[in-house]
Swiss-Prot record:
Catalytic activity annotation: adenosine(37) in tRNA + dimethylallyl diphosphate = N(6)-dimethylallyladenosine(37) in tRNA + diphosphate
Family: Belongs to the IPP transferase family.
Lineage: Bacteria, Pseudomonadati, Pseudomonadota, Gammaproteobacteria, Pseudomonadales
Protein name per its UniProtKB record: tRNA dimethylallyltransferase
Originating species: Pseudomonas fluorescens (strain Pf0-1)
UniProt record, GO biological process: tRNA modification
Amino acid sequence: MSQLPPAIFLMGPTAAGKTDLAIELTKVLPCELISVDSALVYRGMDIGTAKPSKELLAEFPHRLIDILDPAEAYSAADFRRDALEAMAEITARGKIPLLVGGTMLYYKALIEGLADMPAADPEVRAQIEEEAARLGWQALHDQLAAIDPESAARIHPNDPQRLSRALEVYRVSGQSMTELRLKQSVQSTEAAASGLQQLPYTVANLAIAPTNRQVLHERIKQRFTNMLEQGFIDEVVALRNRSDLHAGLPSIRAVGYRQVWDFLDGKLTSAEMQERGIIATRQLAKRQFTWLRSWKDLHWLDSLDCDNLPRALKYLGTISILS
């Protein structure tokens, strides 16, 4: 039997009810919560991220919520570092880390580790930005396609941050992101074969979602409508009023925020903004489902069931995560 300390992953698509179940679990288990969400890290972005209320967070604290200003970037590597530190602190107090959220790349980074990418090089980054100003980002995307077609296929020409980083990695290291990630994948496979652990925990993997996809779509539509009624547009106006924030930042590119930003720019009508915001959220949920379908040892719960807490506890007891 493994002597590794326990941890619980509670995953699922957006609007599935992850937070509610996580709160119920913390009421009956010695758990402490860690958020796994690339948008919830930002302060001042509350309505559009469906961030738990201040009252709820005061009663049930979540690590890694409201830790950054929207002007700052936060990578999967940053998350892995912060999450491992939080998990170690929680475990040291005899508690169980309960990680809850839907940013699947973060879970993957935590489980498998990350490719050893070169550190940012301000000089190279400045050179890339100068080229972009002179030639346009499409020309730089063409450069990336020539050296790393796999990354170019994933990165849109209008995503300057990721495009710049992919070119920077190649210019600094002489290897493409795809090559470095392939090397990391091989190392992870070899580590698993030799019994080495990327993550020093015995992890129970839970996922919650409605079995009826149409129900999820209706939830997404209703939640986006509720956000607008709660003042989502005013929240984005406050962000736009800051001179250091712009549409190219990761925070502003978050689902919902980019559509409201475009509306305020006059690029979309109110109806178009609502429609595109809902569609973008559905597309996010679809991507989350794609990740989850490939996840190993995953125990599914139906959002519509009224007995998910006992079902989750039964599963955790079955795999001896609580012993």
